Amino acid sequence: MTDLSHPNPQFSAADAEKLAIEVFGVTATASPLDSERDRNFRLETGTDADWILKIVNASEPQVESEFQTALLHHLSNADAKLAVPQLKPSLSGDVLASAVATGGERHAMRLVGWLPGVPLAEVKRTFELMRNLGRSLGELDHALQGFIHPGAVRELDWDLRHAGRARTRLHFVRDADRRALLERFIVRFENHVAPKLSRLRAQVIHNDANDWNVLVSKGDHEQIAGLIDFGDAVHTVLIAEVAIACAYSILDMEDPIGAAAALAAGFHEKYPLKAEEIDLLFDLIAMRLVTSVTFSASRHDKTDDNPYLAISEAPAWRLLEKMDAMNPRFATAILRKACGFDAIEGAGAVRKWIADNSKTFAPIVRPAPATMTKALVPYGDATHFMTVASAEQRAKEATEWWDNFCAENNVQLGIGPWGEKRTVYTDTAFESRFIEGQRRIHHLGVDLFMPAGTPLYTPLAATVVSVEIEREPLGYGGLVKLEHRPEGCPPFVTLWGHMAHEALGRLKPGQKLKAGDLVGHMGDIHENGGWTPHLHFEMTTDINLTATEILGVGEAAYLDVWADVFPDVAALAGIPPETFHQDGRTRAEIIAKRKEILLPNLSISYSEPIKFVRGDGTWLID
Protein backbone atom coordinates (compact mmCIF):
# COMPACT_ATOMS: atom_id res chain seq x y z
CA MET A 1 0.00 0.00 0.00
CA THR A 2 1.23 3.49 -0.85
CA ASP A 3 2.33 5.52 2.19
CA LEU A 4 0.19 8.66 1.92
CA SER A 5 2.58 10.55 4.18
CA HIS A 6 5.48 9.89 1.81
CA PRO A 7 6.25 13.04 -0.22
CA ASN A 8 5.31 13.23 -3.88
CA PRO A 9 8.08 12.44 -6.36
CA GLN A 10 10.39 15.43 -6.75
CA PHE A 11 10.47 16.10 -10.49
CA SER A 12 10.15 19.43 -12.30
CA ALA A 13 8.50 20.14 -15.63
CA ALA A 14 11.95 20.28 -17.20
CA ASP A 15 12.73 16.86 -15.72
CA ALA A 16 9.49 15.53 -17.21
CA GLU A 17 10.32 16.86 -20.67
CA LYS A 18 13.74 15.23 -20.51
CA LEU A 19 12.31 11.87 -19.42
CA ALA A 20 9.69 12.02 -22.17
CA ILE A 21 12.25 12.38 -24.94
CA GLU A 22 14.92 10.08 -23.48
CA VAL A 23 12.69 7.23 -22.29
CA PHE A 24 9.67 7.40 -24.60
CA GLY A 25 10.91 9.35 -27.61
CA VAL A 26 8.23 12.03 -27.19
CA THR A 27 9.11 15.68 -27.66
CA ALA A 28 6.66 17.80 -25.70
CA THR A 29 6.08 20.70 -23.34
CA ALA A 30 5.30 19.55 -19.78
CA SER A 31 2.86 21.15 -17.33
CA PRO A 32 2.13 19.73 -13.84
CA LEU A 33 -1.23 18.20 -12.89
CA ASP A 34 -2.69 17.87 -9.40
CA SER A 35 -2.25 14.47 -7.77
CA GLU A 36 -2.77 13.11 -4.28
CA ARG A 37 0.46 11.12 -4.00
CA ASP A 38 2.16 10.81 -7.43
CA ARG A 39 3.68 13.38 -9.80
CA ASN A 40 1.77 13.81 -13.05
CA PHE A 41 2.52 15.99 -16.07
CA ARG A 42 0.60 16.76 -19.20
CA LEU A 43 2.83 16.52 -22.25
CA GLU A 44 1.67 18.69 -25.14
CA THR A 45 3.22 17.78 -28.47
CA GLY A 46 1.56 20.39 -30.65
CA THR A 47 -0.50 17.67 -32.33
CA ASP A 48 -3.60 15.75 -31.28
CA ALA A 49 -1.43 13.09 -29.64
CA ASP A 50 -0.86 14.55 -26.16
CA TRP A 51 0.25 12.41 -23.23
CA ILE A 52 0.30 12.14 -19.45
CA LEU A 53 3.56 11.20 -17.79
CA LYS A 54 2.84 9.53 -14.46
CA ILE A 55 5.75 9.24 -12.03
CA VAL A 56 4.66 6.92 -9.23
CA ASN A 57 5.24 7.56 -5.52
CA ALA A 58 8.32 5.63 -4.41
CA SER A 59 6.38 4.03 -1.55
CA GLU A 60 4.02 2.21 -3.97
CA PRO A 61 4.96 -1.48 -4.16
CA GLN A 62 6.16 -2.66 -7.56
CA VAL A 63 3.35 -5.22 -7.79
CA GLU A 64 0.75 -2.44 -7.52
CA SER A 65 2.38 -0.46 -10.32
CA GLU A 66 2.41 -3.61 -12.43
CA PHE A 67 -1.26 -4.21 -11.58
CA GLN A 68 -2.35 -0.84 -12.96
CA THR A 69 -0.36 -1.44 -16.13
CA ALA A 70 -1.91 -4.90 -16.55
CA LEU A 71 -5.39 -3.46 -15.94
CA LEU A 72 -5.05 -0.85 -18.68
CA HIS A 73 -3.61 -3.48 -21.01
CA HIS A 74 -6.59 -5.77 -20.26
CA LEU A 75 -9.10 -3.01 -21.04
CA SER A 76 -7.38 -2.15 -24.31
CA ASN A 77 -7.75 -5.79 -25.39
CA ALA A 78 -11.28 -6.19 -24.01
CA ASP A 79 -12.74 -3.66 -26.43
CA ALA A 80 -14.37 -1.78 -23.56
CA LYS A 81 -16.68 0.92 -24.89
CA LEU A 82 -15.56 3.50 -22.33
CA ALA A 83 -12.40 5.31 -23.39
CA VAL A 84 -9.51 4.85 -20.94
CA PRO A 85 -5.86 5.91 -21.19
CA GLN A 86 -3.78 3.90 -23.65
CA LEU A 87 -0.26 2.86 -22.66
CA LYS A 88 2.75 3.91 -24.75
CA PRO A 89 5.78 1.61 -24.47
CA SER A 90 9.19 3.08 -23.78
CA LEU A 91 11.89 3.05 -26.44
CA SER A 92 13.09 -0.23 -24.93
CA GLY A 93 9.60 -1.74 -25.18
CA ASP A 94 8.61 -1.52 -21.51
CA VAL A 95 5.15 -0.18 -20.61
CA LEU A 96 6.34 0.35 -17.03
CA ALA A 97 9.62 2.24 -17.04
CA SER A 98 11.51 3.88 -14.16
CA ALA A 99 13.14 7.18 -13.26
CA VAL A 100 15.54 8.29 -10.53
CA ALA A 101 14.89 11.53 -8.65
CA THR A 102 17.66 13.95 -7.69
CA GLY A 103 17.56 12.51 -4.16
CA GLY A 104 18.32 9.04 -5.46
CA GLU A 105 14.85 7.50 -5.09
CA ARG A 106 13.74 5.24 -7.93
CA HIS A 107 10.16 5.64 -9.20
CA ALA A 108 8.05 3.56 -11.55
CA MET A 109 6.88 5.58 -14.53
CA ARG A 110 4.38 5.15 -17.34
CA LEU A 111 3.19 7.23 -20.30
CA VAL A 112 -0.50 7.13 -21.18
CA GLY A 113 -2.55 8.87 -23.81
CA TRP A 114 -4.27 12.15 -23.00
CA LEU A 115 -8.04 11.76 -23.30
CA PRO A 116 -9.97 14.70 -24.75
CA GLY A 117 -13.01 15.89 -22.86
CA VAL A 118 -14.30 18.14 -20.10
CA PRO A 119 -14.17 17.09 -16.43
CA LEU A 120 -17.60 16.25 -15.05
CA ALA A 121 -16.86 18.75 -12.27
CA GLU A 122 -17.06 21.60 -14.77
CA VAL A 123 -20.43 20.87 -16.41
CA LYS A 124 -24.08 21.07 -15.40
CA ARG A 125 -25.28 17.71 -14.13
CA THR A 126 -28.54 16.21 -15.36
CA PHE A 127 -30.25 12.91 -14.67
CA GLU A 128 -29.48 11.83 -18.24
CA LEU A 129 -25.79 12.53 -17.69
CA MET A 130 -25.92 10.50 -14.45
CA ARG A 131 -27.64 7.64 -16.26
CA ASN A 132 -24.99 7.69 -18.99
CA LEU A 133 -22.22 7.70 -16.39
CA GLY A 134 -23.79 4.65 -14.78
CA ARG A 135 -24.00 2.91 -18.15
CA SER A 136 -20.33 3.64 -18.88
CA LEU A 137 -19.17 2.34 -15.51
CA GLY A 138 -21.37 -0.73 -15.91
CA GLU A 139 -19.74 -1.47 -19.25
CA LEU A 140 -16.28 -0.90 -17.76
CA ASP A 141 -16.83 -3.23 -14.81
CA HIS A 142 -18.44 -5.83 -17.02
CA ALA A 143 -15.23 -5.78 -19.08
CA LEU A 144 -13.21 -6.18 -15.86
CA GLN A 145 -15.27 -9.15 -14.70
CA GLY A 146 -12.89 -12.07 -14.21
CA PHE A 147 -9.72 -9.95 -14.42
CA ILE A 148 -7.38 -10.43 -11.47
CA HIS A 149 -3.76 -9.60 -10.62
CA PRO A 150 -1.71 -10.04 -7.42
CA GLY A 151 -1.47 -6.27 -7.06
CA ALA A 152 -5.26 -5.90 -7.04
CA VAL A 153 -5.60 -7.56 -3.65
CA ARG A 154 -4.13 -4.84 -1.49
CA GLU A 155 -4.74 -2.77 1.62
CA LEU A 156 -6.16 0.59 0.61
CA ASP A 157 -7.79 3.10 2.94
CA TRP A 158 -9.99 4.22 0.03
CA ASP A 159 -11.41 0.68 -0.23
CA LEU A 160 -14.99 1.12 1.04
CA ARG A 161 -14.77 -2.17 2.91
CA HIS A 162 -12.46 -0.30 5.28
CA ALA A 163 -14.57 2.86 5.55
CA GLY A 164 -15.00 2.27 9.28
CA ARG A 165 -11.37 3.34 9.72
CA ALA A 166 -12.67 6.89 9.48
CA ARG A 167 -13.43 6.58 13.20
CA THR A 168 -9.68 6.83 13.91
CA ARG A 169 -9.64 10.24 12.17
CA LEU A 170 -12.72 11.75 13.82
CA HIS A 171 -10.65 13.70 16.35
CA PHE A 172 -9.18 15.76 13.50
CA VAL A 173 -12.65 17.22 12.81
CA ARG A 174 -12.75 20.23 15.11
CA ASP A 175 -16.46 21.09 14.91
CA ALA A 176 -18.45 19.04 17.46
CA ASP A 177 -21.67 18.99 15.43
CA ARG A 178 -19.83 17.74 12.37
CA ARG A 179 -18.08 15.05 14.40
CA ALA A 180 -21.47 13.91 15.70
CA LEU A 181 -22.84 13.79 12.15
CA LEU A 182 -19.93 11.61 10.99
CA GLU A 183 -20.31 9.42 14.07
CA ARG A 184 -23.92 8.64 13.12
CA PHE A 185 -22.90 7.43 9.66
CA ILE A 186 -19.99 5.42 11.05
CA VAL A 187 -22.22 3.69 13.61
CA ARG A 188 -24.70 2.76 10.86
CA PHE A 189 -21.83 1.41 8.78
CA GLU A 190 -20.42 -0.64 11.65
CA ASN A 191 -23.79 -2.07 12.69
CA HIS A 192 -25.69 -2.51 9.44
CA VAL A 193 -23.27 -2.44 6.49
CA ALA A 194 -19.85 -3.87 7.37
CA PRO A 195 -21.24 -7.27 8.51
CA LYS A 196 -22.88 -7.77 5.08
CA LEU A 197 -20.00 -6.77 2.80
CA SER A 198 -18.29 -10.16 2.76
CA ARG A 199 -21.43 -11.69 1.20
CA LEU A 200 -21.48 -9.30 -1.77
CA ARG A 201 -19.93 -9.79 -5.22
CA ALA A 202 -16.35 -8.58 -5.49
CA GLN A 203 -14.04 -7.88 -8.43
CA VAL A 204 -11.52 -5.34 -9.70
CA ILE A 205 -13.07 -1.87 -10.05
CA HIS A 206 -11.78 1.62 -10.90
CA ASN A 207 -12.62 2.76 -7.36
CA ASP A 208 -12.27 6.51 -7.94
CA ALA A 209 -14.79 7.74 -10.53
CA ASN A 210 -14.84 11.20 -8.99
CA ASP A 211 -16.00 14.23 -10.92
CA TRP A 212 -12.44 15.14 -11.99
CA ASN A 213 -11.63 11.63 -13.25
CA VAL A 214 -14.79 11.38 -15.37
CA LEU A 215 -14.66 13.20 -18.72
CA VAL A 216 -17.68 14.27 -20.75
CA SER A 217 -17.79 15.10 -24.43
CA LYS A 218 -16.91 18.67 -25.37
CA GLY A 219 -19.73 18.75 -27.90
CA ASP A 220 -22.39 17.04 -25.77
CA HIS A 221 -22.14 17.37 -22.01
CA GLU A 222 -24.57 14.50 -21.46
CA GLN A 223 -22.25 11.94 -23.08
CA ILE A 224 -19.33 10.32 -21.24
CA ALA A 225 -16.03 10.69 -23.11
CA GLY A 226 -13.66 8.76 -20.87
CA LEU A 227 -12.32 7.77 -17.47
CA ILE A 228 -8.83 8.50 -16.19
CA ASP A 229 -6.59 7.75 -13.18
CA PHE A 230 -6.70 4.07 -12.24
CA GLY A 231 -4.34 4.62 -9.31
CA ASP A 232 -6.90 3.50 -6.71
CA ALA A 233 -8.12 0.44 -8.61
CA VAL A 234 -8.60 -2.50 -6.27
CA HIS A 235 -10.38 -5.81 -5.86
CA THR A 236 -13.40 -4.98 -3.69
CA VAL A 237 -17.18 -5.09 -3.61
CA LEU A 238 -18.74 -4.26 -6.97
CA ILE A 239 -21.34 -1.87 -5.54
CA ALA A 240 -18.50 0.38 -4.33
CA GLU A 241 -18.01 1.50 -7.95
CA VAL A 242 -21.55 2.87 -8.02
CA ALA A 243 -21.31 4.38 -4.54
CA ILE A 244 -18.07 6.24 -5.24
CA ALA A 245 -19.30 7.63 -8.55
CA CYS A 246 -22.51 8.76 -6.85
CA ALA A 247 -20.69 10.39 -3.94
CA TYR A 248 -18.93 12.87 -6.22
CA SER A 249 -21.27 13.25 -9.18
CA ILE A 250 -24.37 14.16 -7.12
CA LEU A 251 -22.65 16.93 -5.14
CA ASP A 252 -24.77 20.11 -4.98
CA MET A 253 -27.59 18.65 -7.09
CA GLU A 254 -31.14 19.64 -6.11
CA ASP A 255 -32.22 16.01 -5.93
CA PRO A 256 -29.07 14.06 -5.03
CA ILE A 257 -30.79 10.73 -4.34
CA GLY A 258 -32.75 11.01 -7.58
CA ALA A 259 -29.45 11.61 -9.38
CA ALA A 260 -27.88 8.63 -7.61
CA ALA A 261 -30.88 6.53 -8.62
CA ALA A 262 -30.38 7.53 -12.27
CA LEU A 263 -26.70 6.57 -12.09
CA ALA A 264 -27.47 3.24 -10.41
CA ALA A 265 -30.18 2.52 -12.98
CA GLY A 266 -27.72 3.17 -15.82
CA PHE A 267 -25.17 0.81 -14.25
CA HIS A 268 -27.88 -1.80 -13.66
CA GLU A 269 -28.86 -1.60 -17.34
CA LYS A 270 -25.38 -2.68 -18.45
CA TYR A 271 -24.30 -4.81 -15.47
CA PRO A 272 -27.31 -5.90 -13.37
CA LEU A 273 -27.04 -5.20 -9.67
CA LYS A 274 -28.57 -7.34 -6.94
CA ALA A 275 -31.12 -6.08 -4.43
CA GLU A 276 -28.79 -6.77 -1.50
CA GLU A 277 -26.16 -4.54 -3.14
CA ILE A 278 -28.57 -1.66 -3.69
CA ASP A 279 -29.75 -1.99 -0.09
CA LEU A 280 -26.28 -0.81 1.06
CA LEU A 281 -25.79 1.90 -1.55
CA PHE A 282 -27.06 4.88 0.46
CA ASP A 283 -24.71 4.13 3.36
CA LEU A 284 -21.75 3.44 1.08
CA ILE A 285 -22.25 6.79 -0.68
CA ALA A 286 -22.23 8.49 2.71
CA MET A 287 -19.16 6.57 3.88
CA ARG A 288 -17.14 7.57 0.81
CA LEU A 289 -17.85 11.18 1.78
CA VAL A 290 -17.02 10.44 5.43
CA THR A 291 -13.71 8.93 4.32
CA SER A 292 -12.95 11.97 2.18
CA VAL A 293 -13.69 14.66 4.76
CA THR A 294 -11.88 12.85 7.58
CA PHE A 295 -8.77 12.41 5.43
CA SER A 296 -8.92 16.10 4.54
CA ALA A 297 -9.23 17.01 8.21
CA SER A 298 -6.28 14.79 9.15
CA ARG A 299 -4.01 16.44 6.58
CA HIS A 300 -4.93 20.08 6.95
CA ASP A 301 -1.70 20.94 8.75
CA LYS A 302 0.44 19.19 6.11
CA THR A 303 -1.41 19.69 2.86
CA ASP A 304 -3.07 23.10 2.95
CA ASP A 305 -1.27 23.90 -0.31
CA ASN A 306 -2.51 20.74 -2.09
CA PRO A 307 -5.83 21.65 -3.79
CA TYR A 308 -6.44 18.06 -4.92
CA LEU A 309 -7.15 16.82 -1.39
CA ALA A 310 -9.68 19.49 -0.44
CA ILE A 311 -11.22 19.96 -3.87
CA SER A 312 -14.64 18.57 -2.93
CA GLU A 313 -14.62 19.04 0.86
CA ALA A 314 -17.20 21.85 1.14
CA PRO A 315 -19.74 20.23 -1.22
CA ALA A 316 -19.14 16.91 0.55
CA TRP A 317 -20.15 18.43 3.88
CA ARG A 318 -23.27 19.90 2.31
CA LEU A 319 -24.27 16.53 0.89
CA LEU A 320 -23.57 14.75 4.18
CA GLU A 321 -25.83 17.21 5.98
CA LYS A 322 -28.61 16.58 3.44
CA MET A 323 -28.22 12.82 3.73
CA ASP A 324 -28.22 13.02 7.51
CA ALA A 325 -31.69 14.60 7.34
CA MET A 326 -33.04 11.81 5.10
CA ASN A 327 -34.64 8.58 6.20
CA PRO A 328 -32.21 5.97 4.80
CA ARG A 329 -35.06 3.51 4.27
CA PHE A 330 -36.86 5.94 1.96
CA ALA A 331 -33.65 6.77 0.10
CA THR A 332 -33.01 3.06 -0.39
CA ALA A 333 -36.58 2.61 -1.62
CA ILE A 334 -35.92 5.24 -4.31
CA LEU A 335 -32.71 3.51 -5.37
CA ARG A 336 -34.35 0.06 -5.47
CA LYS A 337 -37.31 1.26 -7.53
CA ALA A 338 -35.02 2.95 -10.07
CA CYS A 339 -33.34 -0.41 -10.70
CA GLY A 340 -36.61 -2.27 -11.21
CA PHE A 341 -36.99 -3.84 -7.77
CA ASP A 342 -39.89 -3.41 -5.37
CA ALA A 343 -39.16 -0.27 -3.36
CA ILE A 344 -39.71 -2.49 -0.32
CA GLU A 345 -39.13 -6.23 -0.60
CA GLY A 346 -42.53 -7.90 -0.97
CA ALA A 347 -44.48 -4.71 -1.76
CA GLY A 348 -45.84 -6.12 -5.01
CA ALA A 349 -47.02 -9.28 -3.26
CA VAL A 350 -48.87 -7.24 -0.61
CA ARG A 351 -50.63 -5.13 -3.22
CA LYS A 352 -51.67 -8.23 -5.18
CA TRP A 353 -52.95 -10.01 -2.06
CA ILE A 354 -55.13 -7.05 -1.11
CA ALA A 355 -56.55 -6.82 -4.63
CA ASP A 356 -57.28 -10.56 -4.71
CA ASN A 357 -58.92 -10.63 -1.26
CA SER A 358 -60.77 -7.31 -1.20
CA LYS A 359 -64.20 -8.99 -0.87
CA THR A 360 -63.25 -10.69 2.40
CA PHE A 361 -62.38 -7.65 4.52
CA ALA A 362 -64.54 -6.58 7.46
CA PRO A 363 -66.07 -3.09 7.03
CA ILE A 364 -63.91 -0.32 8.46
CA VAL A 365 -67.05 1.69 9.30
CA ARG A 366 -70.68 0.65 9.62
CA PRO A 367 -72.55 0.48 7.36
CA ALA A 368 -69.88 -0.55 4.84
CA PRO A 369 -68.40 2.33 2.80
CA ALA A 370 -69.53 0.76 -0.48
CA THR A 371 -73.19 1.15 0.56
CA MET A 372 -72.96 4.80 1.63
CA THR A 373 -73.53 7.90 -0.47
CA LYS A 374 -70.10 9.40 -1.00
CA ALA A 375 -68.44 12.59 -2.18
CA LEU A 376 -64.83 13.64 -2.63
CA VAL A 377 -63.64 16.21 -0.10
CA PRO A 378 -62.43 19.33 -1.99
CA TYR A 379 -58.83 19.32 -0.68
CA GLY A 380 -57.66 18.86 -4.27
CA ASP A 381 -58.96 22.37 -5.08
CA ALA A 382 -56.41 24.89 -3.79
CA THR A 383 -58.91 27.76 -3.90
CA HIS A 384 -61.83 26.02 -2.21
CA PHE A 385 -63.04 27.52 1.05
CA MET A 386 -62.61 24.25 2.96
CA THR A 387 -59.04 23.84 1.70
CA VAL A 388 -58.04 27.41 2.55
CA ALA A 389 -59.67 27.29 5.98
CA SER A 390 -57.96 23.98 6.81
CA ALA A 391 -54.54 25.26 5.70
CA GLU A 392 -55.02 28.36 7.87
CA GLN A 393 -55.96 26.14 10.83
CA ARG A 394 -59.57 27.37 10.91
CA ALA A 395 -60.88 23.85 11.41
CA LYS A 396 -64.25 24.87 12.88
CA GLU A 397 -65.10 26.92 9.79
CA ALA A 398 -63.95 24.13 7.47
CA THR A 399 -66.04 21.63 9.43
CA GLU A 400 -69.13 23.83 9.34
CA TRP A 401 -68.87 24.12 5.55
CA TRP A 402 -68.44 20.35 5.16
CA ASP A 403 -71.34 19.50 7.49
CA ASN A 404 -73.64 21.84 5.58
CA PHE A 405 -72.54 20.36 2.24
CA CYS A 406 -73.24 16.82 3.48
CA ALA A 407 -76.67 17.78 4.81
CA GLU A 408 -77.67 19.49 1.57
CA ASN A 409 -76.44 16.66 -0.67
CA ASN A 410 -77.27 13.64 1.48
CA VAL A 411 -73.58 12.68 1.73
CA GLN A 412 -72.82 10.06 4.37
CA LEU A 413 -69.10 9.61 3.75
CA GLY A 414 -66.45 12.02 2.51
CA ILE A 415 -63.40 10.61 0.74
CA GLY A 416 -59.90 12.02 0.32
CA PRO A 417 -58.16 9.82 -2.29
CA TRP A 418 -54.63 8.44 -2.41
CA GLY A 419 -52.20 10.47 -4.55
CA GLU A 420 -54.32 13.61 -4.57
CA LYS A 421 -52.33 16.83 -5.01
CA ARG A 422 -53.05 19.18 -2.13
CA THR A 423 -51.94 22.66 -1.06
CA VAL A 424 -53.31 22.30 2.46
CA TYR A 425 -49.93 21.16 3.82
CA THR A 426 -48.31 24.51 4.60
CA ASP A 427 -46.15 23.72 7.64
CA THR A 428 -42.35 23.47 7.29
CA ALA A 429 -42.67 19.82 8.31
CA PHE A 430 -43.91 19.11 4.78
CA GLU A 431 -40.74 20.38 3.06
CA SER A 432 -39.03 17.63 1.08
CA ARG A 433 -35.93 16.05 2.59
CA PHE A 434 -34.91 14.81 -0.84
CA ILE A 435 -35.56 17.58 -3.36
CA GLU A 436 -34.37 21.08 -2.54
CA GLY A 437 -37.10 23.72 -2.75
CA GLN A 438 -39.98 21.26 -3.10
CA ARG A 439 -42.76 20.23 -0.74
CA ARG A 440 -44.55 16.98 -0.08
CA ILE A 441 -48.05 17.63 -1.40
CA HIS A 442 -49.43 14.29 -2.63
CA HIS A 443 -51.67 12.42 -0.20
CA LEU A 444 -50.42 8.91 0.63
CA GLY A 445 -53.42 7.66 2.58
CA VAL A 446 -57.17 7.62 2.14
CA ASP A 447 -59.29 9.98 4.23
CA LEU A 448 -62.73 8.99 5.48
CA PHE A 449 -64.77 12.00 6.65
CA MET A 450 -67.58 11.26 9.11
CA PRO A 451 -68.74 12.87 12.37
CA ALA A 452 -66.44 12.88 15.40
CA GLY A 453 -66.97 9.77 17.50
CA THR A 454 -67.66 7.47 14.54
CA PRO A 455 -66.45 3.95 15.50
CA LEU A 456 -63.67 2.44 13.37
CA TYR A 457 -62.99 -1.28 12.95
CA THR A 458 -60.00 -3.24 11.69
CA PRO A 459 -60.67 -4.96 8.35
CA LEU A 460 -58.22 -7.77 9.19
CA ALA A 461 -56.86 -9.52 12.24
CA ALA A 462 -54.13 -7.36 13.72
CA THR A 463 -51.61 -6.83 16.49
CA VAL A 464 -51.38 -3.41 18.12
CA VAL A 465 -47.88 -2.00 17.58
CA SER A 466 -48.25 1.46 19.11
CA VAL A 467 -50.79 3.96 20.39
CA GLU A 468 -49.63 7.56 20.75
CA ILE A 469 -50.57 11.20 20.47
CA GLU A 470 -48.95 13.62 18.01
CA ARG A 471 -49.73 17.08 19.37
CA GLU A 472 -48.25 19.34 16.65
CA PRO A 473 -50.74 21.58 14.78
CA LEU A 474 -51.97 19.82 11.63
CA GLY A 475 -50.40 16.62 12.96
CA TYR A 476 -52.12 13.28 13.49
CA GLY A 477 -53.47 13.79 17.00
CA GLY A 478 -54.44 10.29 18.20
CA LEU A 479 -52.38 7.77 16.26
CA VAL A 480 -52.68 3.96 16.19
CA LYS A 481 -50.39 1.55 14.37
CA LEU A 482 -51.48 -2.04 13.67
CA GLU A 483 -49.54 -4.91 12.12
CA HIS A 484 -51.23 -7.49 9.91
CA ARG A 485 -49.85 -10.92 8.98
CA PRO A 486 -52.49 -12.59 6.81
CA GLU A 487 -51.77 -16.07 5.52
CA GLY A 488 -50.10 -16.05 2.11
CA CYS A 489 -49.08 -12.38 2.30
CA PRO A 490 -45.96 -10.57 3.55
CA PRO A 491 -46.66 -8.58 6.73
CA PHE A 492 -47.76 -4.97 6.48
CA VAL A 493 -48.85 -2.15 8.76
CA THR A 494 -51.90 0.11 8.86
CA LEU A 495 -51.86 3.60 10.34
CA TRP A 496 -54.94 5.22 11.85
CA GLY A 497 -54.55 8.98 12.24
CA HIS A 498 -56.67 11.80 13.71
CA MET A 499 -58.20 9.41 16.24
CA ALA A 500 -59.89 10.17 19.56
CA HIS A 501 -57.51 9.87 22.52
CA GLU A 502 -59.67 7.26 24.25
CA ALA A 503 -57.80 4.54 22.32
CA LEU A 504 -54.69 5.36 24.33
CA GLY A 505 -56.23 3.91 27.48
CA ARG A 506 -57.87 0.93 25.79
CA LEU A 507 -55.28 -0.43 23.35
CA LYS A 508 -51.88 -1.75 24.42
CA PRO A 509 -48.86 -2.78 22.29
CA GLY A 510 -49.03 -6.51 21.62
CA GLN A 511 -52.81 -6.66 22.00
CA LYS A 512 -54.52 -8.95 19.46
CA LEU A 513 -57.53 -7.78 17.46
CA LYS A 514 -59.82 -9.93 15.32
CA ALA A 515 -61.18 -8.74 11.99
CA GLY A 516 -64.07 -6.40 12.76
CA ASP A 517 -62.85 -5.47 16.26
CA LEU A 518 -63.03 -1.85 17.38
CA VAL A 519 -59.83 0.15 16.83
CA GLY A 520 -61.07 3.53 18.01
CA HIS A 521 -63.18 6.54 17.10
CA MET A 522 -62.74 9.54 14.84
CA GLY A 523 -61.35 12.38 16.92
CA ASP A 524 -62.85 15.83 17.27
CA ILE A 525 -60.97 19.01 16.32
CA HIS A 526 -59.39 19.47 19.76
CA GLU A 527 -57.70 16.03 19.69
CA ASN A 528 -57.16 15.18 16.02
CA GLY A 529 -54.47 17.73 15.14
CA GLY A 530 -56.88 20.53 14.30
CA TRP A 531 -58.76 19.07 11.32
CA THR A 532 -62.34 18.52 10.22
CA PRO A 533 -63.13 15.12 11.84
CA HIS A 534 -61.90 12.27 9.67
CA LEU A 535 -59.73 9.17 9.66
CA HIS A 536 -56.42 9.25 7.81
CA PHE A 537 -56.12 5.58 6.90
CA GLU A 538 -52.83 4.42 5.45
CA MET A 539 -50.76 1.31 5.04
CA THR A 540 -47.06 0.63 4.62
CA THR A 541 -45.19 -2.41 3.41
CA ASP A 542 -42.19 -1.37 5.54
CA ILE A 543 -43.01 -2.82 8.95
CA ASN A 544 -39.85 -1.34 10.48
CA LEU A 545 -41.07 2.26 10.25
CA THR A 546 -42.34 3.86 13.44
CA ALA A 547 -45.78 5.44 13.36
CA THR A 548 -44.35 8.96 13.10
CA GLU A 549 -41.92 7.92 10.33
CA ILE A 550 -44.79 6.90 8.06
CA LEU A 551 -45.24 9.69 5.53
CA GLY A 552 -48.76 11.04 5.15
CA VAL A 553 -47.84 12.99 2.02
CA GLY A 554 -45.04 12.60 -0.50
CA GLU A 555 -43.22 14.22 -3.40
CA ALA A 556 -44.69 14.07 -6.90
CA ALA A 557 -41.36 12.87 -8.30
CA TYR A 558 -41.51 9.70 -6.21
CA LEU A 559 -45.17 8.70 -6.36
CA ASP A 560 -44.17 5.39 -7.98
CA VAL A 561 -41.90 4.72 -4.99
CA TRP A 562 -44.51 5.75 -2.44
CA ALA A 563 -47.04 3.47 -4.20
CA ASP A 564 -44.83 0.56 -3.11
CA VAL A 565 -43.97 1.84 0.36
CA PHE A 566 -47.43 3.29 1.13
CA PRO A 567 -49.86 1.58 -1.28
CA ASP A 568 -53.32 2.91 -2.01
CA VAL A 569 -55.41 1.60 0.87
CA ALA A 570 -58.83 2.19 -0.72
CA ALA A 571 -59.53 -1.51 -1.34
CA LEU A 572 -58.61 -2.39 2.25
CA ALA A 573 -60.98 0.35 3.43
CA GLY A 574 -63.78 -1.11 1.30
CA ILE A 575 -64.07 1.89 -1.03
CA PRO A 576 -65.04 0.78 -4.56
CA PRO A 577 -63.01 2.07 -7.53
CA GLU A 578 -65.94 3.97 -9.08
CA THR A 579 -65.78 6.35 -6.11
CA PHE A 580 -62.77 7.99 -7.75
CA HIS A 581 -63.38 7.55 -11.47
CA GLN A 582 -66.05 6.23 -13.81
CA ASP A 583 -65.46 5.10 -17.37
CA GLY A 584 -67.86 4.78 -20.28
CA ARG A 585 -70.78 6.95 -21.34
CA THR A 586 -72.66 9.40 -19.17
CA ARG A 587 -76.34 8.78 -18.30
CA ALA A 588 -77.46 11.30 -20.95
CA GLU A 589 -75.27 9.65 -23.61
CA ILE A 590 -76.69 6.24 -22.75
CA ILE A 591 -80.30 7.46 -23.11
CA ALA A 592 -79.51 9.04 -26.48
CA LYS A 593 -77.85 5.85 -27.72
CA ARG A 594 -80.80 3.71 -26.56
CA LYS A 595 -83.26 5.92 -28.43
CA GLU A 596 -81.09 5.63 -31.53
CA ILE A 597 -80.87 1.83 -31.66
CA LEU A 598 -83.91 0.50 -29.73
CA LEU A 599 -87.45 0.22 -31.09
CA PRO A 600 -90.08 2.46 -29.44
CA ASN A 601 -91.95 -0.58 -28.07
CA LEU A 602 -88.89 -1.51 -25.95
CA SER A 603 -89.56 0.60 -22.92
CA ILE A 604 -87.04 1.69 -20.30
CA SER A 605 -88.10 0.39 -16.88
CA TYR A 606 -86.96 3.41 -14.87
CA SER A 607 -88.00 7.03 -15.17
CA GLU A 608 -84.30 7.84 -14.68
CA PRO A 609 -82.23 5.06 -16.29
CA ILE A 610 -79.60 3.40 -14.13
CA LYS A 611 -75.93 4.04 -14.90
CA PHE A 612 -74.05 0.78 -14.31
CA VAL A 613 -70.36 1.35 -13.56
CA ARG A 614 -68.98 -2.20 -13.38
CA GLY A 615 -69.77 -5.86 -13.01
CA ASP A 616 -68.93 -8.02 -10.00
CA GLY A 617 -69.60 -11.72 -10.52
CA THR A 618 -73.34 -12.05 -11.24
CA TRP A 619 -74.04 -8.51 -10.05
CA LEU A 620 -74.26 -5.21 -11.88
CA ILE A 621 -73.04 -2.30 -9.78
CA ASP A 622 -74.69 1.10 -10.20
Q: Model regions: which residues?
A:
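ATP/Mg2+ or Mg2+-diphosphate-binding catalytic cores
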Residues: 4, 171-172, 292-347
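A conserved alpha-helical element in kinase catalytic cores
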Residues: 55-106, 122-124, 128-131
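A cross-family kinase active-site recognition segment
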Residues: 91, 122-177, 200-202
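Active-site activation/catalytic loop segments of kinase-like enzymes and analogous catalytic loops
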Residues: 239-272, 286-303
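Polar/charged, compositionally biased leader and regulatory segments
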Residues: 340-447, 558-582
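Zn2+-dependent peptidoglycan hydrolase active-site motif and core
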Residues: 458-503
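Active-site-adjacent loop/helix segments that line or gate small-molecule/cofactor pockets in enzymes
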Residues: 583-614
